[in-house]
Amino acid sequence: MSVNLASQLREGTKKSHSMAENVGFVKCFLKGVVEKNSYRKLVGNLYFVYSAMEEEMAKFKDHPILSHIYFPELNRKQSLEQDLQFYYGSNWRQEVKISAAGQAYVDRVRQVAATAPELLVAHSYTRYLGDLSGGQILKKIAQNAMNLHDGGTAFYEFADIDDEKAFKNTYRQAMNDLPIDQATAERIVDEANDAFAMNMKMFNELEGNLIKAIGIMVFNSLTRRRSQGSTEVGLATSEG
């Protein structure tokens, strides 16, 4: 019997989604204010997070639950490697360092995989649906804000997915068809909210560099008004 997990996740993470949209770094990004050094640090953190998540998902590709949402065409690790080479150069593996919040996120993904792998559903949902929902819009914002012409936005490009909207529907249906009970669904929703919180901590770490670049007065003017969470653009968070 279906527990309509996709709907439960959408409803159960609405507050977290709104909170994520109101982090200063995200609000500035959505308004077209992106500081390159802060952004490349975010790309670095995402590289470590996706590397961990995709490694663990691959381990469980035959899992009775996770096998239903194992879509390697979603994988972002290689795209992030392209972007890191763009921002840091060929020596990027020696240059990129994970932040404290990024490490906490990776540690949680590893812990879940080791103790309750079904909760990886929450991390997959939180990351990939956001990527699919706002990818093209966020790509254009990044290109315009940082004057990018020849790279730096591979993260937002899904070369192996022809129709992103149709794929999102397929993904949601796969979540709804997962062989889980209501108690497990509730644990997945709780984990998704925790994933949102971990994303927000990564964003908060970046605000110092952004403020130094644009000034506190500009930052405050851009972040003063609270968003109502109506947009489906998810900067590294699910569509909500």
Curated annotation (Swiss-Prot):
Catalyzes the opening of the heme ring with the release of iron. Key enzyme in the synthesis of the chromophoric part of the photosynthetic antennae. It is an enzyme of class 1 (oxidoreductase). The keyword Transcription regulation does not apply. Its EC number is 1.14.14.18. Heme b binds at R10, H17, Y125, K168, R172. This is Heme oxygenase 1. One of its GO terms (molecular function) is metal ion binding. The gene is pbsA1. Keywords: Heme, Iron, Metal-binding, Oxidoreductase, Photosynthesis. Gene3D superfamilies: Heme oxygenase-like (1.20.910.10). It catalyses: heme b + 3 reduced [NADPH--hemoprotein reductase] + 3 O2 = biliverdin IXalpha + CO + Fe(2+) + 3 oxidized [NADPH--hemoprotein reductase] + 3 H2O + H(+). One of its GO terms (biological process) is photosynthesis. It comes from Synechocystis sp. (strain ATCC 27184 / PCC 6803 / Kazusa). Pfam families: Heme_oxygenase. Belongs to the heme oxygenase family.
